[in-house]
Regions:
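Active-site beta->alpha N-cap acidic-glycine motif
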Residues: 1-41, 45-66, 145, 158-163
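Structural recognition of the beta-strand scaffold that forms the well-ordered cores
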Residues: 1-5, 26-31, 67-71, 90-95, ...
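Active-site environment of divalent metal-dependent phosphoester hydrolases
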Residues: 34-36, 75-78, 99, 133-135
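His/Asp/Glu-enriched short active-site or ligand-binding loop at hydrolase and phosphoryl-transfer sites
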Residues: 75, 80-119, 151-163
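Solvent-exposed, polar/charged alpha-helical surfaces in well-ordered, non-transmembrane soluble domains
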Residues: 15-18, 22, 44-51, 55, ...
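Terminal accessory/targeting
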Residues: 1-2, 122-164
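A short alpha-helix capping/helix-coil boundary motif
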Residues: 33, 58-61, 94-95, 119-123
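Soluble non-cytosolic domains of exported or imported proteins
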Residues: 4, 11, 40-47, 74-75, ...
Length: 164
């Protein structure tokens, strides 16, 4: 899996970050403060949002962060995409998501399965938030159901290899 993390998640969960890396997961950049990046006009401000996450990741793990970036809320402008590219980042978006991030209004397991199973498609990049209790409860079963539907899983790193 690829986990796109923000600054406070890194600060609050250093052991989990180390575990993600140890298990071979990719940890990507979701900005330090989770702002609306489409409203950021300068390279300096944009770079700081990403470099602060990079620096904290390196402090925790001793390693450089993979240059994968996901804009908060999927908000961006064309200048932002170029800024990320100029910093050496690959920008990723999702093709399948549902409202799972509201901690006080979690979908039921049935609602989650209905949305996630009904919307899966070849080549899907699925967005699931770690703040979702429901996602934690259904993840193993969800992955098994997708596999039984004939889907296979791959990393974003492998996706990039197929494009090169």
């Amino acid at each position: 899996a690829t986990f796109f993390v923000v600054g406070n998640f890194l600060q609050d969960n250093p052991d989990l970050i180390k575990q993600m890396q140890k298990e071979g997961h990719t940890v990507g950049n979701h900005t330090y403060h989770h702002p609306d990046m489409s409203q950021i006009a300068t390279q300096e401000t944009f770079s700081k949002e990403l470099s602060d996450v990079e620096d904290l990741f390196k402090k925790i793990t001793g390693k450089s962060m993979t240059r994968f970036y996901r804009p908060p809320q999927g908000k961006y402008n064309t200048e932002n995409l170029q800024m990320a590219k100029d910093m050496g980042y690959h920008t990723f978006f999702w093709s399948l998501a549902y409202v799972d991030w509201l901690t006080d209004a979690q979908p039921s397991k049935e609602e989650a399965f209905d949305k996630l199973l009904g919307r899966i498609h070849p080549g899907a990049i699925v967005l699931l938030h770690n703040t979702s209790k429901t996602n934690g409860e259904i993840l193993d079963e969800l992955l098994n159901k997708w596999e039984s539907m004939g889907y296979q899983f791959s990393s974003l790193k492998n996706l990039l290899k197929t494009e090169e």
